[in-house]
Design a protein with these regions (language model features):
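Periplasmic-binding protein-like
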Residues: 29-30, 84-94, 149-155, 181-186, ...
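Hydrophobic alpha-helical segments within soluble ligand-binding/sensing domains
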Residues: 123-152, 190-198, 249-270
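Flexible loop/hinge segments that line or gate small-molecule binding clefts
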Residues: 93-136, 235-246
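Short beta-strand elements in bilobed, periplasmic/extracellular small-molecule ligand-binding domains
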Residues: 54-69, 151-153, 163-193
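Flexible loop/turn connectors
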Residues: 194, 198-307
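Amphipathic helical "hinge" segments at domain boundaries
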Residues: 1-80, 85-88
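An alpha-beta-alpha
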Residues: 137-174, 272-292
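Hydrophobic structural packing positions in well-ordered secondary structure
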Residues: 28, 53, 90, 111, ...
Length: 307
């Protein structure tokens, strides 16, 4: 037939088929409704959400653009801008919902949230960390390192499932090794939190603490406790807690999966709120650190523990 393969054209076609990064064809919206918009990504976890989502969007042929929703750009006005730019996909990071979300017409958009489904009334796909599973894993690893009286200090909030995972981890343990968790009320003063921790330490006598509250190391230091000499310490989110050992919640993966879910909705032409919300939980991974060394139980203490 006289046909000769064009090597350059064949190479370009192969590159297009196999490249992980596709040409950018459209935009996706990241809605930031924080009163101080810059504060959102000052949290390392949430900045990683953005990084993971941005990379995944580029690989799928999209660009992730941030839109700050406030008095100057209310949700109703933003909707017109998104329509004009043909933006049909919205990714909502953690934080407050945009004012006016109840009356906004979501029917033209595919929507995914990067937050606990218990923190929102929007029926969407929600991608978040497996808080209960992470707490159970952390408590188990702490026991494997020789700690027997592992306590939990956290914020009293039903939407946060760390405490639930901790309580499940206590089931089947020796009753003398079960500790009552300390749940601090959000909004109370640091001094009230400090006094609560002081009483709890006296009542429960933990040899290690699992926490999701970044102020715990400083509070323990003020009370005269040394980490790790006096007790071990592990965090349920090491990126935003000044604690070296604990759970890495894999936030970049949370952002990546959020985009993956959003692109799937767009491809299937699924628009608007869902009839039934769906939860995608991402498991964390354990990170060793100096705040939780392996504990050596002295023979005398070991004997007294089994008496």
């Amino acid at each position: 037939m006289g046909y000769h393969l064009n090597p350059s054209g064949a190479a370009l076609a192969h590159l297009r088929r196999t490249s992980k990064v596709r040409p950018v064809e459209a935009s996706l919206a990241w809605l930031n409704a924080w009163p101080d918009p810059g504060k959102l990504r000052r949290y390392r976890e949430f900045d990683c959400y953005w990084q993971g989502a941005s990379r995944a969007a580029l690989e799928a042929g999209y660009r992730l653009d941030e839109f700050v929703v406030n008095d100057e750009l209310p949700l109703r006005k933003l909707g017109k801008i998104l329509q004009a730019r043909n933006v049909n996909g919205i990714l909502m990071p953690p934080g407050p919902l945009p004012p006016g979300w109840e009356d906004f017409d979501w029917s033209g958009y595919s929507l995914v949230q990067l937050r606990s489904p218990r923190l929102t009334s929007l029926a969407t796909i929600s991608v978040s960390s497996d808080q209960a599973g992470n707490a159970m894993m952390a408590a188990q690893i702490m026991r494997s390192k020789g700690y027997r009286r592992v306590g939990f200090v956290g914020i009293k909030c039903q939407a946060r499932m760390f405490g639930a995972g901790y309580l499940w981890s206590q089931q089947g343990r020796n009753p003398r090794e079960r500790l009552t968790p300390l749940l601090l009320k959000e909004g109370e003063s640091p001094e009230i939190h400090l006094r609560s921790l002081e009483r709890w330490m006296g009542d429960q006598s933990p040899d290690a603490i699992l926490t999701d509250f970044p102020a715990v190391p400083e509070m323990l230091a003020r009370l005269g406790f040394r980490v790790p000499q006096d007790l071990g310490l592990a965090a349920l989110g090491i990126l935003d807690c000044p604690i070296s050992a604990g759970i890495h919640q894999n936030p970049c993966e949370i952002g990546r999966i959020g985009i993956q879910q959003l692109v799937s909705l767009l491809s299937g032409n699924v628009r608007g709120l869902l009839a039934i919300g769906q939860d995608v939980l991402v498991k964390g991974t354990w990170t060793d650190g100096s705040s939780l060394p392996r504990r050596r139980v002295r023979p005398r203490l070991a004997e007294s523990a089994v008496e």
